[in-house]
Amino acid sequence: MGNNGSVERRTVLKAAGASLATLGLAATTGCGGDSGSSGDGTVTIRYAWWGADERAKRINQSIALFEKKYPKIKVKTDFQDYVAFWEKFQTQAAGGNPPDVFQNAVGFLRKYDKRGVLLDLKTQIDAGNLSLDNFRAGVEKVGQVDGKQLGIPVGSNTMSLVIDEKVFEKAGINPKQGWTWDEYFAALKKIHDTQKLPGDTGYFGIMYLYDLYLRQNGKAFFTKDGLGFDEADLTEWWTDAYNRVKAGIITDPKRVEQDKPKSSLSAAHGASEFTWDNFTVRYSAEGTSTYGLAPIPTTDGKQTGQYLASLMLSASARTKHPKEVAQFINFMVHDPEVGKIMGYDRGILATTEQFDAYKPTDAPNQAIAKYETDVAAAGVLGTITPHPAGADTCEAAFLRIAGDMSQGTTKVADAVKQFFSEAKTALAS
């Protein structure tokens, strides 16, 4: 998908109205160029992604390996930050000149498939140029829409709860798999009452967390062509959240804004925060406490509603080199050396070849790998919620309107009506 407990993602979504899953944070650009063929049979393909300098460095090292194995395929690169990437891509797609292969997220699959931008990679899979073997926990299905394979995952992530372990230990709280929302909210109140610290930094605007809550209760944020919940559902969610903000159990939204670009969790202005598991390396870098990953609360003591989301590689329906693009994607998701180079930069490595090849040595990444392995072993992973065209705009609206509601600038009832109005427009476009 692709923001959410992550300060960077909140900022990006407000600026761009864009989605998910994972993102790079520094605004940098590489060189672009036209794809084509030369007289000696060498083919050039264009590859674009969003990310920071560190991601660019890793990807360029991976491309060097690919070009060594496939000397007749050259790769021209282009990268920006998340906002600039999607602005440029939208212009390129509208002009009929998108890159041959590009980084993508689930929130954009139906949107650009609807516009005829994405190549169905099944033909290249059937031709033997691209393999769907050895993907972890069925994550390859994230890239499937209406029987078409529109994206190939490069990494996976799932929602998690990051906690300040020292605060939770002092409060005598030990979250375990299957704990309930009632237990979670009781824990937040206990932390507030005993340590004068908000228990959570603001869960109520995270679309992907609310989706898990809805899934636990037989619904979902989206259906294939619309919203999967009603105004009464959201009114209850936001009313409860507003009351907790007023009671001091949730961090004051104004404080959250002041803490940026830091997280209010790592700034010691909250004791927990929901975010994607692969984002959690930031807390140890930013904060002075120790941070851990706790299970998602449940409604029934069993099901968390979780699924694996993913960054993926997609191809242009207009590419003149579908075979070479498929070979490139295949190399980038299956080659063990690429896995060692990329690490968890784009999520937990999606294929077993790469997952087994990369062994993190730092504690935060070891914890992320263990968390995702434990979630899979717990048997709680389901199929990802459908993301209709316009899902990215809905996510941005949900975050923005929830922020206004939590600060009291918009009443809950008005905020709910505003969200449903904006979502209806976005999903109809």
Regions of interest found by a model, annotated:
Residues 79-88, 107, 179-183, 253-263:
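Short helix-initiation/N-cap motifs at beta->coil->alpha
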Residues 2-111, 126-132, 300-301, 321-324, ...:
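Conserved N-terminal structural module of periplasmic/extracytoplasmic solute-binding proteins
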Residues 279-288, 300-397:
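C-terminal lobe and pocket-closing loops
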Residues 106-158, 292-294, 363-366:
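Hinge/lid segment of periplasmic solute-binding proteins
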Residues 188, 226-254:
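Glycine-centered hinge/linker elements that transmit conformational signals in sensory
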Residues 86-97, 115, 167-168, 186-193, ...:
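Short helices/loops that flank or line small-molecule/ion binding pockets
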Residues 122-135, 177, 199, 219-236, ...:
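Short, solvent-exposed loop/beta-turn-alpha elements that line the ligand-binding surface or hinge
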Residues 92, 99-100, 129-167, 302-305, ...:
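A structural signal for short loop-to-beta-strand junctions that line the ligand-binding cleft
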